[in-house]
């Protein structure tokens, strides 16, 4: 990307920092995850969780959600102004699972938000540590990406279910900041913009007045974020058109959906970070590991190494397969929901299967599920190799206009071929090339038509042994050319519903 020099690395976005050198970045990311770990240990102490209970991923998620809720200013304000029956705006809580007489029991806990905020700040040297909160949001978002399908959401905004690989980060809250924007897929940004334009069409006052001015600023900011994800001049020029539109309407929606489709071949650059559950950082801190001193990176070997030595458990429903549950969480930990299964399988060292073949539901347990029959098992989160996470879409020639990988948004910087059926995709582009954006559309279609399926992405990049922390000896895997492995084929996952 040409503008690389002006961009902050994701670790800087993650930690809200200005430009820093590599060591400072590693230290500030280390400080962030260390703070999460200290907070988690403190919460486990207050809740009197045993070591085993503290390693239960469901307990980790309840604690993470409580702190996110405690710091959700906008929602807290809303709850105070619109009191609803039986909801205390000053409290937050959730299910904590404990082991009693060989059985798991669910206990609903309630906490003062103020108290949780105090505990969190204390663990983070008295600061609000927004970066740590965003980090937890991204972990939840990555888990949702691996667990649920967004077909309904896609169809509602006029997109096609086949665009599911563009939907990374679609469940991230609005308040997730620059680090959140970096991990959102092209489809997610398009969906947010389309929803906004639709509101403007239906509500005359949406763009008017003082509020409308703020709305307009938000609209243009979102357009710029999306523009920054595209890597070709024509796609960016179309985004300028959408952003500058006097009063955005159906023409802009058409343009955005066209751009989303084009991103199936001309991939956008979307960041990937390995964000782990709070309990993993807690375990490391408890064992005496000093994250800030050692430094930490979300895109290198560190998360792999951390998972190599962490034992995390999960509740398992009666007919779920523990190995499948492990795969789900492994994918979430490495932000690999949209990665090619061939690449994931190679790195993990065990076969990663498409979601349609998984015998497992989500990680979280609904409040009406029967605890009598719940069991627990160890999640297998270790890997055979490690690889560097990427923020490029895997386009081939000089990372510019060329074939990215259909139905895959690469997570790991690892060489792979791009088996794809161009015909299937180009079929989506018959139709409208007139209007203000006609020349750009023509140019984009031309680039897509010249994309060659036999190209190789991430040429020469490989995976590394876990002992090779300086990434000196890349092992370039060779994959079966014929089939690209998308996680979403034959999909029967549940929908994500708030």
From Swiss-Prot:
Keywords: Capsid protein, Helical capsid protein, Host nucleus, Host-virus interaction, Ribonucleoprotein, RNA-binding, Viral nucleoprotein, Viral penetration into host nucleus, Virion, Virus entry into host cell. GO terms for molecular function: RNA binding; structural molecule activity. A motif (Bipartite nuclear localization signal) lies at residues 198-216. A motif (Unconventional nuclear localization signal) lies at residues 1-18. Signal peptide: none annotated. It is found in: Virion; Host nucleus. GO terms for cellular component: helical viral capsid; host cell; host cell nucleus; ribonucleoprotein complex; viral nucleocapsid. Late in virus-infected cells, may be cleaved from a 56-kDa protein to a 53-kDa protein by a cellular caspase. This cleavage might be a marker for the onset of apoptosis in infected cells or have a specific function in virus host interaction. GO terms for biological process: symbiont entry into host cell; viral penetration into host nucleus. Residues 1-21 are annotated as: Disordered. Transmembrane segments: none annotated. Encapsidates the negative strand viral RNA, protecting it from nucleases. The encapsidated genomic RNA is termed the ribonucleoprotein (RNP) and serves as template for transcription and replication. The RNP needs to be localized in the host nucleus to start an infectious cycle, but is too large to diffuse through the nuclear pore complex. NP comprises at least 2 nuclear localization signals that are responsible for the active RNP import into the nucleus through cellular importin alpha/beta pathway. Belongs to the influenza viruses nucleoprotein family. Homomultimerizes to form the nucleocapsid. May bind host exportin-1/XPO1. Binds to viral genomic RNA. Protein-RNA contacts are mediated by a combination of electrostatic interactions between positively charged residues and the phosphate backbone and planar interactions between aromatic side chains and bases. This is Nucleoprotein. The lineage of its organism: Viruses, Riboviria, Orthornavirae, Negarnaviricota, Polyploviricotina.
């Amino acid at each position: 990307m040409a503008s690389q020099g002006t961009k902050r690395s994701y670790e800087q976005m993650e930690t809200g920092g200005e430009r820093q050198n590599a060591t400072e970045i590693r230290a500030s990311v280390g400080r962030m995850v260390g703070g999460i770990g200290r907070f988690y240990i403190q919460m486990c102490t207050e809740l009197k969780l045993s070591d085993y209970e503290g390693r239960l991923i469901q307990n980790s998620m309840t604690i993470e959600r409580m702190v996110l809720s405690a710091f959700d200013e906008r929602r807290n304000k809303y709850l105070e102004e619109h009191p609803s029956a039986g909801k205390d705006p000053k409290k937050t809580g959730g299910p904590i699972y404990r082991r009693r007489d060989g059985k798991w029991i669910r206990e609903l806990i309630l906490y003062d938000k103020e108290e949780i905020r105090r505990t969190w700040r204390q663990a983070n040297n008295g600061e609000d540590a927004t970066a740590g909160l965003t980090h937890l949001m991204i972990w939840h978002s990555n888990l949702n990406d691996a667990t649920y399908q967004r077909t309904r959401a896609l169809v509602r905004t006029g997109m096609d279910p086949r665009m599911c690989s563009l939907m990374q980060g679609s469940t991230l809250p609005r308040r997730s900041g620059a680090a959140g924007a970096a991990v959102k897929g092209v489809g997610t940004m398009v969906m947010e913009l389309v929803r906004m334009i639709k509101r403007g069409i239906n509500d005359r006052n949406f763009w008017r007045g003082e509020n409308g001015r703020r709305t307009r600023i938000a609209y243009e900011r979102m357009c710029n974020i999306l523009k920054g994800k595209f890597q070709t001049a024509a796609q960016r020029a179309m985004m300028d058109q959408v952003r500058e539109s006097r009063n955005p309407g159906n023409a802009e929606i058409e343009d955005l959906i066209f751009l989303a489709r084009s991103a199936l071949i001309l991939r956008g650059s979307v960041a990937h970070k390995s964000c782990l559950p709070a309990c993993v950082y807690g375990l490391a801190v408890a064992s005496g590991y000093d994250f800030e001193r050692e430094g930490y990176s979300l895109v290198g070997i560190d998360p792999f190494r951390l998972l190599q030595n962490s034992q995390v458990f999960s509740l398992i429903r009666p007919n779920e397969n523990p190995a499948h549950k492990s795969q789900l969480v492994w994918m979430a930990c490495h932000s690999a929901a949209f990665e090619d299964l061939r690449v994931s399988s190679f790195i993990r060292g065990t076969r990663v299967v498409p979601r349609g073949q998984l015998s497992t539901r989500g990680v979280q347990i609904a409040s009406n599920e029967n605890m009598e029959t719940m069991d627990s098992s160890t999640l297998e989160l270790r890997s055979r190799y490690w690889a560097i996470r990427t923020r490029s879409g895997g386009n081939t020639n000089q990372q510019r206009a060329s074939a990215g990988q259909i139905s895959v948004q690469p997570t790991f910087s690892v060489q792979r071929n791009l088996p794809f059926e161009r015909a299937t995709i180009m079929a989506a582009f018959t139709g409208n090339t007139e209007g203000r954006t006609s020349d750009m559309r023509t140019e984009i279609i031309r680039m897509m038509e010249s994309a060659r399926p036999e190209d190789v992405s991430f040429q020469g990049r490989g995976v590394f042994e876990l002992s090779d922390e300086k990434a000196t000896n890349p092992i370039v895997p060779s994959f079966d050319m014929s089939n690209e492995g998308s996680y979403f084929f034959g999909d029967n996952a549940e929908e994500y519903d708030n």
